From Swiss-Prot:
Keywords: ATP synthesis, Cell inner membrane, Cell membrane, CF(1), Hydrogen ion transport, Ion transport, Membrane, Transport. This is ATP synthase subunit delta. It is found in: Cell inner membrane. The gene is atpH. F(1)F(0) ATP synthase produces ATP from ADP in the presence of a proton or sodium gradient. F-type ATPases consist of two structural domains, F(1) containing the extramembraneous catalytic core and F(0) containing the membrane proton channel, linked together by a central stalk and a peripheral stalk. During catalysis, ATP synthesis in the catalytic domain of F(1) is coupled via a rotary mechanism of the central stalk subunits to proton translocation. The keyword Translocase does not apply. F-type ATPases have 2 components, F(1) - the catalytic core - and F(0) - the membrane proton channel. F(1) has five subunits: alpha(3), beta(3), gamma(1), delta(1), epsilon(1). F(0) has three main subunits: a(1), b(2) and c(10-14). The alpha and beta chains form an alternating ring which encloses part of the gamma chain. F(1) is attached to F(0) by a central stalk formed by the gamma and epsilon chains, while a peripheral stalk is formed by the delta and b chains. It is a peripheral membrane protein. Signal peptide: none annotated. It comes from Pseudoalteromonas translucida (strain TAC 125). The keyword Transmembrane does not apply.
C-alpha cells in the first residue's frame, strides 16, 4: 500500500491544490470518493484491464462514473490512465480526504473502551482532545472487552493507552526486567 500512496501523493496534492484554489474541496472529495470506489471494484477493474489503450480505459472509466466526475475530474482520470495509474485512485481519494481534514483542522480519533461510552463521557473526551490537539475532533468509538477498563485513544500517529490491560502489560514487563 505504501507504494500506491507514493504514486497517489502527487495526484492527490495537485487535485487538492486545485480544489482549494477553486473553492471546490467538498465536491472534489465526493468525486474522488466515488471514483476510488469504482477503481477498487473488482468487476470494473477487470473490465478496465481488458482495454487495449489508456485512452479507451479513461473513456470507459468516465462512462462508468457518468455525471459523478466534473471536467477537472475527467482530466485527472485521463492523466492517470495515460500513466497507468488508475489503480492508485483509491489511495488518491484517501490522501485527498487526509489533506482536507488537515486543511479543515480536523482529526479522526479512534477510542476503544471495554464498555460503550455514554454521551457525557464522549463530550468530555472530545473537549479534552480538541484542547490537546488544537483541532476539531471526530470521535470513532468501539468496544473491546480485552481492554478490561479505561481507554485506548488513537489519533494519527499518537496512541494513548490508558487501559487496565495496558497498565497490566507494562507492570508485567517491569517485573520481568
Amino acid at each position: 500500500m505504501s507504494e500506491l500512496t507514493t504514486i497517489a501523493r502527487p495526484y492527490a496534492k495537485a487535485a487538492f491544490e486545485l480544489a482549494v484554489e477553486k473553492g471546490t474541496i467538498e465536491s472534489w472529495n465526493e468525486m474522488l470518493f466515488f471514483a476510488g470506489h469504482v477503481a477498487s471494484n473488482e468487476k470494473a477493474s477487470a473490465l478496465l484491464a481488458g482495454m487495449p489503450t489508456a485512452t479507451t480505459q479513461a473513456e470507459l472509466f468516465i462512462q462508468i462514473c457518468a455525471e459523478q466526475l466534473n471536467e477537472q475530474g475527467q482530466n485527472l482520470v485521463k492523466v492517470m490512465a495515460e500513466n497507468g495509474r488508475l489503480i492508485a485512485l483509491p489511495a488518491v481519494a484517501q490522501l485527498f480526504a487526509k489533506f482536507k481534514a488537515e486543511y479543515d483542522k480536523e482529526i479522526d480519533v479512534d477510542v476503544i473502551s471495554a464498555t460503550p461510552l455514554v454521551a457525557a463521557q464522549q463530550e468530555s473526551l472530545v473537549a479534552a482532545l480538541e484542547k490537546r490537539f488544537a483541532r476539531k475532533v471526530k470521535l470513532n468509538c468501539s468496544e473491546d472487552a480485552a481492554v478490561v477498563g479505561g481507554l485506548i485513544i488513537k489519533a494519527g500517529d499518537t496512541v494513548i493507552d490508558g487501559s487496565i490491560r495496558g497498565k497490566l502489560n507494562r507492570l508485567a514487563t517491569t517485573l520481568q526486567s
